[in-house]
């Protein structure tokens, strides 16, 4: 049995998730691959697998229940957070993981190939790249935990949005000032997240364009 199976199972249950043993196994395979590749390629600053479990896996899982359905784009996915976690837990959802860092995308492509995952692709490009905007099309949900600035994330997401698209931004503190600047154009729902074993403030912001 994987040394972190019980911890992941308990953590996911604390988040109100009922993940199958198969999905838990996939999540742990992902973490094992991340730990292995991280030794050579520096994919994440977090090196301790136990800390990775909390700050990457459980943190990403904490938004799962609140995400709307539909095709998903994860902008600045890095090593795959939260996009790969979502894809592994929701095989019926089509996911695109986007990052400009070649090493991180190589890792994700290799993992996708090794596990023969059908619902997720990793793309190396800059979010503002015109060709990528044309090729990838539009998405129902756009996630990120990479952007320091909410305004920057919204601007990056715009070309990939339908009128009904939900922007799902993972944040620590609530960026009240930035939300004020967006309030004429976007409705915003703020959801407080309780990540097991993480003593930090975490929030999910769900933004949707206000229809004129």
UniProtKB/Swiss-Prot annotation:
Specify the taxonomic lineage.
Answer: Bacteria, Pseudomonadati, Pseudomonadota, Gammaproteobacteria, Moraxellales
Q: Does the keyword tRNA-binding apply?
A: no
The function of this protein is: Specifically methylates the N7 position of guanine in position 527 of 16S rRNA.
Q: Which reaction does it catalyse?
A: guanosine(527) in 16S rRNA + S-adenosyl-L-methionine = N(7)-methylguanosine(527) in 16S rRNA + S-adenosyl-L-homocysteine
- Species of the source: Acinetobacter baylyi (strain ATCC 33305 / BD413 / ADP1)
This protein is called Ribosomal RNA small subunit methyltransferase G
Q: Which PANTHER family match?
A: S-ADENOSYL-L-METHIONINE-DEPENDENT METHYLTRANSFERASES SUPERFAMILY PROTEIN (PTHR31760:SF0)
What Gene Ontology cellular-component terms does the record carry? cytosol
Membrane-spanning regions, if any? none
EC number of this enzyme = 2.1.1.170
Gene3D superfamilies registered for this protein in UniProt = Vaccinia Virus protein VP39
